[in-house]
């Protein structure tokens, strides 16, 4: 599925509005560990800060994004990293050859997807046998509760609009259909510096999956 003009505008607005640096959150860095020599694909890489952080952890990193202007900025700042113009819902053929050890899908990616199955199928095609997927994203429950812990929207509503609320079950099911085995799912309270929530509800989650041999 090609990104619409509405998608691209929404992604640009979110990228510019974020107050914190776009590197890797500490808990993601801990989850990734040493990436020395590993081929890593970063989906929806934006201006490249998090992709560069992956390279600093030792990865042979590739960044993917559908916004040429952001990719041009990334190329100027980090010319040794490969930057690819493409949609995370329909990966370009050169990325679908089963060569990556790890695919990283970071915060904000899931909410920009209209085609969850296309995203999952692309991840599976990019990974080598037994390759890994790491997803770090906003927990869908956090978007349903306001600052006073009152439910402000329906968790079970169908996803729609530029920001889509994919339920955890829908994400896991899409990965299963793509023959990706979910090995762990961890939920975290609190939130990032741009999203602060009551610590009694989940704000973000980490999901680990592996391509079957």
Where are these regions (language model features)?
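Class I SAM-dependent methyltransferase SAM/SAH-binding core
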Residues: 41-91
């Amino acid at each position: 599925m090609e990104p619409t003009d509405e998608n691209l505008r929404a992604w640009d607005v979110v990228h510019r509005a974020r107050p914190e640096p776009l590197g890797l959150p500490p808990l993601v860095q801990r989850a990734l560990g040493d990436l020395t020599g590993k081929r890593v694909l970063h989906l929806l890489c934006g201006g490249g800060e998090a992709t560069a952080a992956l390279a600093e952890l030792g990865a042979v990193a590739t960044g993917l994004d559908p916004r040429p202007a952001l990719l041009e900025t990334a190329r100027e700042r980090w010319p040794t990293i490969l930057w690819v113009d493409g949609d995370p819902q329909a990966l370009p053929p050169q990325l679908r050859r089963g060569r990556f050890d790890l695919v990283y899908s970071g915060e904000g990616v899931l909410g920009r997807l209209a085609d969850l199955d296309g995203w999952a199928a692309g991840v599976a095609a990019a990974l080598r046998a037994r390759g890994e997927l790491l997803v770090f994203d906003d927990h869908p429950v956090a978007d349903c509760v306001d600052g006073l812990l009152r439910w402000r929207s329906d968790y079970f509503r169908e996803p729609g609009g530029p920001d889509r609320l994919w339920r955890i079950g829908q994400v896991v099911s899409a990965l299963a259909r793509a023959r990706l085995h979910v090995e762990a799912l961890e939920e975290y309270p609190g939130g990032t510096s741009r999203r602060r929530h009551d610590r009694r509800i989940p704000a973000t989650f980490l999901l680990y999956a592996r391509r079957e041999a």
